[in-house]
């Protein structure tokens, strides 16, 4: 029986891949790379779902701290917003996820890896590129891209195979991480429609005002309201607070690596507040030429 490592998020796309591989007699190692965004309950449910659908082995790899140390803090240093709008919420974490997937495959001498990306966006390129650079000898399998499978047909297939899971938000492709959440759906395939409230992970709950204070040291946030804590914890707390107000929701339009326009909704209140605060602080402390050089480097 062939073994395959699947980058598994617990969502519809990767659940389809898992069931398809299982039905095709693969020994599936479903691996979740925890770059933040999931509660303990959600992580437990992802594991249960993977084993229920047919994974031979399941593992969740903690990479939240690595994600911050290797990537996020540099995005803060550079006040990085793609098209002055999008904080690279999910795109940035794909590198860490791909590296960990290949690392697991090599450690277990598995010659096949898979991801659930479609053929429309940048994620497919990010995964493929990292996989090919780090392990050109390992074959990449992409069922959804290769078969051009729609989400509607994925649900039909899973139901046909007896997977009785209620995909409450299957209409939307949702990717959650420490640096924000992206949401794709029918609305984002247009140029003028906005995502409805129900598409977001949390419904905004208040219209009240709340004052917060962030403290930075050498470009890194290390205090929230005067209380010292890790940058990761601050991002999590700030994101949770912002979601109550609906702060950080927007739609990004960009040019994909494959040459077409792409549109995606996102919610990244914590990241946006941190970046805007850091940028404002720099306006007060850096000279105009320091700011100019820094902007060139971050671009």
Q: Residues of each region from the PLM?
A:
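Nucleotide-activated chemistry modules centered on ATP-dependent adenylation/adenylyltransferase
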Residues: 1-299
């Amino acid at each position: 029986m062939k073994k395959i490592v699947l980058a598994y998020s617990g969502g519809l796309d990767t659940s389809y891949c898992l069931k398809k591989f299982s039905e095709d007699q693969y020994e599936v190692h479903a691996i979740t790379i925890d770059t933040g965004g999931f509660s303990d309950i959600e992580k437990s449910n992802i594991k249960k779902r993977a084993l229920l659908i047919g994974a031979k082995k399941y593992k969740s790899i903690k990479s939240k701290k690595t994600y911050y140390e290797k990537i996020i803090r540099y995005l803060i240093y550079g006040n990085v917003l793609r098209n002055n709008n999008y904080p690279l919420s999910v795109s940035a974490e794909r590198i860490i996820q791909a590296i960990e997937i290949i690392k697991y495959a090599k450690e277990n001498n598995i010659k096949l890896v898979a991801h659930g990306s479609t053929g429309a966006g940048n994620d497919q390129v990010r995964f493929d590129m990292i996989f090919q650079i780090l392990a050109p000898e390992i074959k990449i399998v992409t069922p959804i891209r290769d078969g051009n499978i729609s989400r509607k047909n994925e649900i039909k297939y899973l139901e046909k195979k007896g997977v009785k899971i209620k995909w409450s938000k299957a209409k939307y492709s949702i990717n959650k991480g420490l640096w924000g959440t992206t949401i794709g759906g029918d609305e984002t395939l247009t140029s003028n429609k906005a995502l409805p409230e129900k598409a977001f992970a949390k419904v905004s709950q208040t219209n009240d005002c709340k004052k917060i204070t962030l403290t930075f040291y050498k470009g890194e946030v290390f205090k929230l309201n005067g209380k010292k804590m890790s940058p990761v914890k601050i991002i999590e707390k700030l994101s949770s607070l912002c979601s109550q107000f609906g702060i950080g929701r927007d739609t990004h339009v960009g040019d994909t690596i494959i040459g077409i326009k792409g549109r995606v909704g996102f919610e990244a209140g914590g990241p946006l507040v941190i970046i805007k605060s850091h940028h404002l602080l720099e306006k007060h402390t850096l000279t105009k030429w320091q700011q100019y050089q820094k902007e060139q480097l971050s671009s």
